[in-house]
Amino acid sequence: MRVLKYFRAPSSLRHRSSPMAQFLRRFSSSPMANEDEFQSPVEPSQQQSQDCVSESYLIGFVIANIVGLKYYSGRINGREMVGLVREPLNVYDNNAIRVLNTRSEQVGHIERTVAAVLAPMIDSHTIVVEGIVPNTRSNSNRYRIPCQIHVFAKLEASSTVKSTISRGGLVLISESDTSFGLSEAVVVKEQMGNGDKRSVDKIFKLVDENVKLMGKLVAAEPPREVIKSELFAHQKEGLGWLLHREKSGELPPFWEEKDGEFLNTLTNYRSDKRPDPLRGGVFADDMGLGKTLTLLSLIAFDRYGNASTSTPTEEPLDGEGDKIEKKGKKRGRGKSSESVTRKKLKTDDVVGMNVSQKTTLIVCPPSVISAWITQLEEHTVPGILKVYMYHGGERTDDVNELMKYDIVLTTYGTLAVEESWEDSPVKKMEWLRIILDEAHTIKNANAQQSRVVCKLKASRRWAVTGTPIQNGSFDLYSLMAFLRFEPFSIKSYWQSLIQRPLGQGNKKGLSRLQVLMATISLRRTKEKSLIGLPPKTVETCYVELSPEERQLYDHMEGEAKGVVQNLINNGSLMRNYSTVLSIILRLRQLCDDMSLCPPELRSFTTSTSVEDVTDKPELLQKLVAALQDGEDFDCPICISPPTNIIITRCAHIFCRACILQTLQRSKPLCPLCRGSLTQSDLYNAPPPPPDSSNTDGEDAKSSTKSSKVSALLSLLMASRQENPNTKSVVFSQFRKMLLLLETPLKAAGFTILRLDGAMTVKKRTQVIGEFGNPELTGPVVLLASLKASGTGINLTAASRVYLFDPWWNPAVEEQAMDRIHRIGQKQEVKMIRMIARNSIEERVLELQQKKKNLANEAFKRRQKKDEREVNVEDVVALMSL
DNA sequence: ACCGCCGGGTGCC
DNA sequence: ACCGCCGGGTGCC
């Protein structure tokens, strides 16, 4: 019987999997022997649409044994997900289903009786399966372990699937018995409409934010011996990122180290073997930002390199030292025949570092080859980087020949042709690095090219593309497979961890994808990049308070310190968070102008007791009123100026509709601080004073100019003297301050425009248009609230920016500057921060710096969920207690 | 004995 | 695998 089966195998395959070959593979522990165990990203039979995944729902699960454990090195601990991969070319059973662990190591097979039922349905895309191993402790059999196979199918196919499974003699444990399954299916269906497309736009959101907020990008200079062109700032930052990704020894995303063990938090895989760091990633800058030059700069380091730059220094390169070292003879011949002097080579040899392979393989579409050549000629010192064209006509079949070059250029087509050529030198070579240019061409639809590049051997892998996602997030799967980013490089894991949750509108899918891309990819868009912009300078202008202001400020600060110290002493600081914020707010307002803080609010001790305001709604209302005419803010849910303002017990502010909807939909928690929150914790804000601008105007007239206002005025006048046509923007976070500024500036002869959160969208665009209008000449000042100037607003008509008060968050300040310093800006830009001396404002600056540093040194710790914008420690620093 | 039964060899697909 | 299954050895009580 067994003999018969053996002969049924296609003869073309027999040599690959002859019993002897199997025997060798089984009992050889050499890593090389596992090379052909590597899973290609696309099984030949599964190339078509992946859409079925998103419309599927869980029909139920069957229990099946994973068998053959003793023949494979992959281990599992139980309570973890496994990858199920069809193996149609298995000689013993074309229904075979392989079981892989998080590390892509094979654990075993699904027992054949079960595979026989499931495999045909998998192949016809009728079902999708996911495997979970419940627990191995109770059932510690060395030869087989049970596994839950979850079966997903389209709603309309479910009855067929169910009967096929039971006819095959399997027991389907179905949740629809409890009527839960079906209702879930309906929900899933409804959410389908806006599933993938909209999410895709968000995938890279975190990438941007991460880069911006964490300031992770550290510029690096390419070696001058190789690269003769000066890089743009964003290219230097890109280079710094590439270097960082290649050298960093940090754990890949979703891995944690826990008492010497390494845990994959998504699959629950545990092992004491450290997962390899991901040396490489997705370089996804927009087209036209100079990715090619940046990559050439990276390659230049292989030759003249080293980190005499500002790049972070990390662990030594190459964890695969042993493996490659064994092939010493190859390296010797390849490199010593090169006569070019290499300073770095020596150093490396002394340190004992592995330098065996310095060749980078670049794969690109044929049309792009000439671009690489042009860039090489244009930007590199002639004769330094040696390039071999492995494309077209005559190509060497000698690996050693290829090793002589720094760069081997080839095309996807060439590789595809060589797929079946065993002795292809490109396939035999162990590259230092592989760069897939225009990597989106290997997306899932192009199975052959995907397969080929995935099998290439290299310790650093880069996917380079300006359009990482064309047909949906599934495109990214091909890149993961190429990067060998475990476990996502196994389709089954990708599907269950990312694709299915995403398709079902499950937040986990998107957030996982965001985290994933944030750590392994870099994407800057053309719009945000700063190519060829005139320089910008940032200055700080310190303002001395007048004696009168000083006296009031010192008095208030003294009082504030007392109040806060009291709260700290009796441990109720955080319970009185709202009080503290309003105290700090008052102090900050005083630095701008005393009239921001009306006389009745000039004492903290009278109106604010030690008890929290939350127990006194009338005080809360006062706070609301103060906030409302004071700080400019957005509803964090809809990210626009709030309508029908609601303030919560925990002092967060939302639109009425937004927060009510949120509370209804999810748990009764505040979306910002996650404190418990019910409808009774919501307080209405009093209706906004409709003619506030009129009364404010009167106020301004009656009061004299504050020190800061005077300082601003003289700065503006000095700039006007220099160039009467300079347009300026003044940002303040206090709406009232912007109103106060109008009168004195008008009086000094400036044309005033105003942009604030209370304006309609239409009005705002009108103001911005007017400000940018070249016919509006003379000294023009735009008084703007930053939050009102949403993203994408263009204020490049201005060349001076005044930040009238400092923001907590340095990124917000940066955003403000970006409105002016962006593409289209023709003049040099000067930014001036206005800071009151010896005041809380100086400490806000320090806080800014601290936050920046924190982000720099520990960017991997993304902001903790409960971290407030300002914490206890910050309060202590701000109050200089 | 074209059976039953014994006990060794063996073990994924 | 302290199992099941296979197939050879064996054969009254």
Curated annotation (Swiss-Prot):
Which EC class heads this enzyme's classification?
A: hydrolase
* Binding positions (ATP): D285, D286, M287, G288, L289, G290, K291, T292
- Residue limits of the Helicase ATP-binding domain? 272-486
Enzyme Commission (EC) number: 3.6.4.-
Q: Write out the GO MF terms.
A: ATP binding; helicase activity; hydrolase activity, acting on acid anhydrides, in phosphorus-containing anhydrides; nucleic acid binding; zinc ion binding
Q: Which biological process terms from the Gene Ontology are attached to this UniProt entry? A: chromatin organization
Q: Which CDD domains match?
A: DEXHc_HLTF1_SMARC3, RING-HC_HLTF, SF2_C_SNF
**Keyword Glycosyltransferase set for record:** no
Q: What Gene Ontology cellular component terms go with this record?
A: nucleus
Region labeled Disordered — which residues?
308-343, 681-703
Stretches annotated zinc finger (RING-type): 635-674
| Assigned protein family | Belongs to the SNF2/RAD54 helicase family. RAD16 subfamily.
The name this protein goes by in its record: Putative SWI/SNF-related matrix-associated actin-dependent regulator of chromatin subfamily A member 3-like 1
Q: What is the lineage of its organism?
A: Eukaryota, Viridiplantae, Streptophyta, Embryophyta, Tracheophyta
